[in-house]
Swiss-Prot record:
SUPFAM superfamilies: Ribokinase-like. ATP binds at residues 119, 166. The gene is thiM. This is Hydroxyethylthiazole kinase. Substrate binds at residues 43, 193. It comes from Methanococcus maripaludis (strain DSM 14266 / JCM 13030 / NBRC 101832 / S2 / LL). Pathway: Cofactor biosynthesis; thiamine diphosphate biosynthesis; 4-methyl-5-(2-phosphoethyl)-thiazole from 5-(2-hydroxyethyl)-4-methylthiazole: step 1/1. It holds the Pfam family HK.
Length: 266
C-alpha cells in the first residue's frame, strides 16, 4: 500500500508527540513501541497539566484498561480539550462488555468527544455498539470475519468515527469504505499489551494522515513487524523484543512487499 509506506516515512520525519492516558500494565511497552517506530510518547494524566500537554501533543490516545475514580475524569477532560483543539483522538475501550463501568466510560467518551478512531477487538466493539442502542451489533463476542466487517461498518456509522475491529483479520471502516488487513501473527496474543501498542501506533499515524488511512497504516506496520519478529524469535519473551526491533527496522520497501490489504466499497 503506497499510502502506508509514505505515512511511515512522514511519521519518522515529523516525530509526532503522542499523549497516552493508558493503563499501568502497558505504559512501558507502549512507550517503547512508539519510540522504536519513530514517534515520541508521553504518558501524562495529571489533571493540572492536561491542558498544556494536550495542546502540544500531535495526537491523544485514551485507553481504559485500568480505570479508577481519578483516571476517568482525566480521560474525559483530555478528550474534551483535544476535541476543542481538533486534535486526533484514538479510543481503546479495553474490556468493554466485561463490566458496566468499562462500557459506560467508553460510551460517555464516544458521546461527547470527537473520536477519530475507535480501536478494539471484536467483543469490545460489539459491546459498546450493542449498549448504544440504535444498532445491536452482534450477539456473540466470538470472532467471525464476516460479522467483524459488518461490526466495523456499523460502529463507524453509529459513532461517526473510524472503527477498527482487530482479530485474525483486521477490519477498518469509516462507514463508506472498508479495509481488511491480514498482517500480524498469533504470537501477539501471548504477549500482554500488543493491542494497546497497536492503538498508540494508530495514534502516531493519525498525526500524519486522515483517521481511516492512519488506522490502516498502524495495523499494517505493526502486523508486518510482528510477522518479521516471529521469524527470528518464536517464543513470547524474545518475540516481544524483536517486535520492537522490527518496528525500528521496517521501511517503505518492506511495507510494499508484505502488506496484505483489501479495500471494499460499501
Amino acid at each position: 500500500m503506497d499510502f502506508v509506506a509514505k505515512n511511515l516515512t512522514k511519521l519518522r520525519e515529523t516525530n509526532p508527540l503522542v499523549q497516552n492516558i493508558t493503563n499501568y500494565v502497558v505504559m512501558n511497552s507502549t512507550a517503547n513501541s512508539l519510540l522504536a517506530l519513530g514517534a515520541s510518547p508521553v504518558m501524562a494524566h495529571a489533571m493540572d497539566e492536561l491542558e498544556e500537554m494536550v495542546s502540544i501533543a500531535s495526537a491523544l490516545v485514551v485507553n481504559i484498561g485500568t480505570l479508577d475514580e481519578y483516571w476517568i475524569p482525566s480521560m474525559e477532560k483530555a478528550a474534551k480539550i483535544a476535541s476543542d483543539l481538533k486534535k486526533p483522538i484514538v479510543l481503546d475501550p479495553v474490556g468493554a462488555g466485561a463490566t458496566k463501568l468499562r462500557t459506560k466510560t467508553a460510551l460517555k467518551i464516544l458521546d461527547f468527544a470527537d473520536i477519530s478512531v475507535l480501536r478494539g477487538n471484536f467483543g469490545e466493539i460489539a459491546a459498546v455498539l450493542g449498549e448504544h442502542g440504535k444498532t445491536r451489533g452482534v450477539d456473540s463476542a466470538a470472532y467471525d470475519s464476516n460479522e467483524a466487517i459488518e461490526l466495523s461498518k456499523n460502529a463507524a456509522k453509529e459513532f461517526n468515527t473510524v472503527s477498527a475491529v482487530t482479530g485474525p483479520v483486521d477490519h477498518v471502516s469509516n462507514g463508506k469504505e472498508i479495509y481488511s488487513i491480514s498482517n500480524g501473527h498469533s504470537m501477539l496474543s501471548k504477549v500482554t499489551g500488543t493491542g494497546c501498542a497497536t492503538t498508540s501506533i494508530i495514534g502516531a499515524f493519525s498525526a500524519v494522515d486522515d483517521p481511516l488511512k492512519a488506522a490502516v497504516s498502524g495495523l499494517v506496520v505493526y502486523g508486518i513487524s510482528a510477522e518479521m519478529a516471529f521469524t527470528e524469535a518464536p517464543y513470547p519473551g524474545t518475540f516481544q523484543a524483536k517486535v520492537y526491533d522490527w518496528l525500528y527496522r521496517i521501511d517503505e520497501k518492506l511495507v510494499l512487499e508484505k502488506a496484505k490489504v483489501n479495500k471494499f466499497e460499501i
